[in-house]
């Protein structure tokens, strides 16, 4: 079983990202779950969401405490949360940032990828200049960095879960797939 933990802030789309990813994995023949964990349920508050998948039926229903991979939708989360808590060695950390992966020496035990999802979201009219919605963008980068899911399945998941601006969300995901910067081992 593979488990992914998303760290974001309310309004960025972490919960929908986990659902889109689960849908994409299901489309590729895997069993998948997606679920959130909320603290203070307000816009801008830290949020975690989770996706787990396997080739066989999943009976586990707990939160993800030892993720295989971590996705950080808001770089400022790194200042308030230990995103590597429980992260398995050699796991991927994907960070929404304009910085290169080498800017994160504290993550030397892990494989690191970065993408400027805020910029790509803004360029595609997703959210606002001060509150870009980066969930679909980050999933394009996740597909490329990890190799765990294909971009076509992500795009189909976007069609299913995103109520508006489907073309803009798909375009942003495709661009993120092309622009993600990967450091460490090649995709699994």
Role assignments for model-derived ranges:
Residues 1-188:
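Active-site cofactor/cluster-binding pocket
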